[in-house]
UniProtKB/Swiss-Prot annotation:
<feature type="site" description="Reactive bond">
    <location>
        <begin position="381"/>
        <end position="382"/>
    </location>
</feature>
<dbReference type="GO" id="GO:0004867">
    <property type="term" value="F:serine-type endopeptidase inhibitor activity"/>
</dbReference>
<dbReference type="InterPro" id="IPR023796">
    <property type="entry name" value="Serpin_dom"/>
</dbReference>
<dbReference type="InterPro" id="IPR042185">
    <property type="entry name" value="Serpin_sf_2"/>
</dbReference>
<dbReference type="GO" id="GO:0005615">
    <property type="term" value="C:extracellular space"/>
</dbReference>
<dbReference type="InterPro" id="IPR000215">
    <property type="entry name" value="Serpin_fam"/>
</dbReference>
<keyword id="KW-0722">Serine protease inhibitor</keyword>
<keyword id="KW-0646">Protease inhibitor</keyword>
<comment type="similarity">
    <text>Belongs to the serpin family.</text>
</comment>
<dbReference type="InterPro" id="IPR042178">
    <property type="entry name" value="Serpin_sf_1"/>
</dbReference>
<dbReference type="InterPro" id="IPR023795">
    <property type="entry name" value="Serpin_CS"/>
</dbReference>
<dbReference type="InterPro" id="IPR036186">
    <property type="entry name" value="Serpin_sf"/>
</dbReference>
<protein>
    <recommendedName>
        <fullName>Uncharacterized serpin-like protein MA_3388</fullName>
    </recommendedName>
</protein>
<dbReference type="Pfam" id="PF00079">
    <property type="entry name" value="Serpin"/>
</dbReference>
Amino acid sequence: MNKIKIAFLVFSLILLCTGCIEDKAVVEKNTAVFEESTINADSVSDYDIAAANNAFAFDMYSQLARRETGDHENVFFSPHSISASMAICYEGAEDTTKEQISNVFYFPSNKTVLKVRMERINDKINSVNSDYELQTANALWVQEGYPVKETYIHNVQKYYDGEVTNLDFAGKPDASRDTINEWVEARTNDKIKDLVPEDAITADARLIITNAVYFNGKWMYEFDKEMTGKKSFYPTKEEDISVDMMYTCNRFNYGETSKAKIIELPYRGNDLSMYVVLPKSNNIEKFETEFTLNDYTELKNDMEVVEEVKTTIPKFKFETKTELSNSLIEMGVVDAFGQADFSGISDSPLEISRVIHQAFIDVKEEGTEAAAATMEEMAMGVSISWDAKPKEFTADHPFMFFIEDGRTNCILFMGKVEYPEYEE
């Protein structure tokens, strides 16, 4: 029997199948009434979804940072988006397929624990705040006539707030592609375009799961546009390029070790921040292979509120579109791409065929837009440094950055700037 192919596009997950199609959309009825798995409430609270998300973020970064050429490569992705999409897929996974996804994404074996925590964290992320825009959205697109289990549909709608829509992939692939891409564009302020490529929806397509994350925020302390000017940036010790560098001097959470400096640049509303990690040595390739989640956490925890930090970082704007299938296989999600068991979704066999992730970021004087506030005190600092000498944070060589939600402690976006460019 042929297996249904799952093309996983993050922000979109596509499940492809070769099973037969009936004239009307079919929802497989379960004889049992919907019953949530019986779990101890403590098991939900004990599962640290932020720790799982952040551990996966560093694992995926290690894959994306691998150099296939000698060219400078910026990195940007949303670990939360990838995890959220795979969580919806995980909801229907069984046996070794489920186990492997769990191991790579640090998901709990109890699916109810995961979906309850996902529901709670998405509620926090999507809570309205007039100081910034942050939203995440899920959708399940089903081939007309393809049988999907009622329990699965119920869980996607209830716990992941997923929209469920029937489309005719087989008869109208182009129209279906346009509909899905328009959905993604609408939820990312038109920043993510053409996520689903022309060759993605074939005659075998049966299910598409999409997740979109969008953030647009202004700095708590904006950079002065009049201070922005062309300055040197050094992609390597031997290279020197001229880029637009922004400058500000203000009170920030700041820290450093013998290997790196870190600064927290908060956004208005004080819920989200960008953390910039600058290696002291201009050797990003060596630094990123040694820099772990524990190192990052310790660096953040050791920050102090410094009254005056002279901060210089480049403006940058770029978009990435990456095939993640091989990376996930190397990380351990093997069976899902071949001998898969997604029987929790449908009795028709399914497997993942491809994974594509697309993300966009724009960092400028006013703030950050990623598709992927004025306050007197900082949320992060434990102590205050009264050193009369100002600290300097000059990001004139490659650095890593993280956009975190302080309410959930989740890394929503993660990346590396190795060659900053900015086009209006």
